[in-house]
């Protein structure tokens, strides 16, 4: 996404933080492409876990193409060092339409199950497409039906893995459910929200916390007006919660505004 940033912003926003130390300290996802065997052994020696890995695919040739790095395929072997060293990991697959979806996604999930249970979770999230894509690979956003297919694939593998390991392992980012216009899974499916900051389970946690707080409220009168701003995907859900609050408190008016993203482009439909 850094290659899709608008020009003229502060320098730190263009910094590609592919650093295992930041993965350990801040949860960054790393590709392992710039790490030596010595670096990997240091992670094992000092127990710098969990390490968050951006896989994208387990197809070595395709990974080289996606990351524009001729060592990207070979870098996948470094996961074996972490696994053999007993290091806990989380992973992500940024899905690109027509590139690493479909059969490639099936292959990636199947390959990554060999690292269970040390690879605790893998999220599948759609690639973000800003309006600043000059010179980049021509990608298109996923359709509603394609989002449904991604969900079906993930849920199929969740059932397989859960039957053997008791965890769901592979998780769909919230955006897939919003795009497919399906309800997000129940809390139990998120295995303790291991990838919350990666956009996996945020809506379910919000819904549950809202209902928990709502159940404690007493009916009353509040002559207030409140404004909420959000982006396209979450808008109907926040609007639904706002209406429920208006029914609870007579006189309360909640205005929910759906904001079009002109800064990054209209195809960026999430807010954080």
Label every model-predicted segment.
Residues 54, 125, 173:
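Conserved residues at the C-terminal ends of beta-strands
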């Amino acid at each position: 996404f850094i290659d899709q940033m608008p020009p003229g912003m502060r320098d730190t926003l263009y910094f590609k933080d592919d650093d295992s130390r930041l993965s350990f300290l801040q949860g960054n996802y790393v590709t392992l492409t710039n790490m030596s065997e010595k670096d990997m052994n240091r992670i094992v020696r000092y127990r710098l876990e969990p390490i968050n890995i951006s896989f994208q695919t387990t197809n070595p040739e395709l990974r080289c193409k996606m990351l524009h790095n001729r060592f990207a395929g070979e870098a996948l072997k470094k996961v074996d060092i972490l696994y053999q060293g007993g290091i806990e990991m989380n992973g992500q697959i940024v899905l690109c339409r027509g590139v690493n979806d479909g059969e490639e996604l099936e292959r990636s999930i199947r390959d990554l199950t060999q690292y269970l249970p040390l690879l605790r979770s893998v999220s599948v999230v759609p690639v973000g497409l800003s309006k600043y894509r000059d010179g980049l690979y021509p990608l298109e956003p996923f359709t509603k039906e394609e989002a449904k297919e991604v969900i079906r694939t993930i849920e199929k593998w969740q059932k397989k893995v859960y039957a053997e390991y008791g965890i769901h392992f592979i998780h769909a980012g919230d955006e897939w459910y919003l795009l497919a216009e399906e309800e997000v899974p129940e809390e139990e499916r998120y295995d303790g929200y291991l990838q919350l900051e990666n956009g996996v389970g945020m809506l379910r946690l919000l819904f549950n916390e809202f209902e928990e707080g709502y159940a404690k409220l007493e009916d009353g009168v509040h002559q207030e007006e409140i404004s909420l701003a959000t982006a396209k995907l979450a808008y109907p859900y926040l609007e639904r919660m706002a209406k429920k609050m208006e029914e609870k408190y007579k006189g309360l008016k909640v205005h929910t505004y759906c904001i079009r993203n002109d800064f990054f482009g209209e195809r960026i439909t999430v807010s954080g």
